[in-house]
A protein has these predicted regions:
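Conserved alpha/beta-hydrolase
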Residues: 112, 119-141
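Gly/Ala-rich beta-loop-alpha elbow adjacent to hydrolase catalytic centers
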Residues: 168-177
Length: 304
């Protein structure tokens, strides 16, 4: 394939998501109000759906230093009788097998390699590092998931490969982690980067993206409560779960220009988490913050 054909193919691939999103918006906006139950079931399914994207070259380079890349089987009632092979990325610290272990956890539609820029500096600071692809993300099987399954993976890995000295969590991983810590997982320090803190915020963002009418939003909330209990929102919102975590110091980092998760989400988490501090950045957005040298330095210094 010549360069022109390759460029045309890439251009078409880049436009596909935009075309699909426009189609979804048209359907939800024009048909959703007429058939809220039918279209609501579709929206409810999309809520749990994940999608995978190609790994950038910079992440491939970060992974080259990993000591071990392998699938680790975990078992939890969340996945029924079958073991789930979770892809893990592990960095040893020389011959020091007793070095404190830091767990990195990515966000929704993310991947373990996204967090790998932290590995080198953490190794230099005397830590070992574990990252992983959560359920239904990148190299770990599954097409749909939710916070309870993703928390089950985090807790199972911590039990199997731990103890975990500290956690560095990005985005949705920063909501999963407080939930995990109130359901048996143990650690000594936590860094949350660009985390959402309210279930309501996630639903509002989802609804805004797909142009969901209120009738569809109401259907989804009722379905959530029917499937997971009337107190679902309180159970998973980290402004609630973090209130129980005053014994664990936390650093919360968020960029003022983050358009995916508003900085107000971190500000409210900071207020709720008794033993937390917060740092603000500018101009980094939601993802570039993960490989900003100052953010990495602040994270490592906090974990020392």
């Amino acid at each position: 394939m010549d360069n022109n054909q390759d460029s045309q193919k890439k251009s078409k691939n880049l436009h596909k998501p935009a075309i699909v999103l426009s189609l979804f918006r048209f359907i939800f906006r024009n048909i959703g109000a007429l058939f809220p139950s039918l279209v609501g079931r579709w929206a409810y399914h999309l809520w749990f759906k994940t999608h995978r994207s190609l790994r950038p070259r910079r992440e491939e380079k970060w992974l080259q230093s990993a000591t071990q890349i392998k699938a680790v089987e975990i078992r939890d009632e969340a996945f029924g009788d079958k073991a789930l092979p979770v892809m893990t990325y592990y960095w040893e610290n020389g011959s020091n097998l007793e070095a404190p272990l830091i767990m990195l956890i990515h966000g929704w539609t993310g991947r373990g390699s996204q967090m790998a820029a932290f590995a080198g500096p953490l190794l230099k600071a005397g830590f070992r590092v574990l990252s992983f692809d959560n359920h239904a993300h990148d190299q770990t099987p599954g097409n749909t998931t939710h916070i309870f399954k993703q928390s089950a993976v985090q807790r199972a890995l911590a039990e199997k490969l731990g103890p975990i000295y500290g956690v560095v969590a990005h985005s949705f991983g920063g909501m999963i982690t407080p939930y995990s810590l109130t359901h048996g997982m143990k650690t000594q320090k936590v860094v949350c980067i660009s985390p959402p803190s309210h279930f309501d915020f996630l639903l509002a963002r989802f609804s805004q993206t797909l142009h969901l009418p209120k009738s569809i939003q109401d259907y989804m909330v009722n379905r959530f409560k029917k499937e997971y209990g009337d107190n679902l929102i309180e159970r998973v919102s980290s402004t609630n779960t973090s209130k129980e975590l005053g014994h664990i110091p936390a650093l919360i980092i968020h960029d003022e220009d983050d358009l995916d998760v508003l900085i107000s989400e971190s500000e409210q988490l900071h207020k709720a988490w008794p033993n937390s501090s917060m740092k603000r950045t500018t101009g980094l957005g939601h993802r570039r913050i993960l490989y900003n040298p100052q953010v990495i330095e602040d994270t490592v210094d906090f974990l020392k």
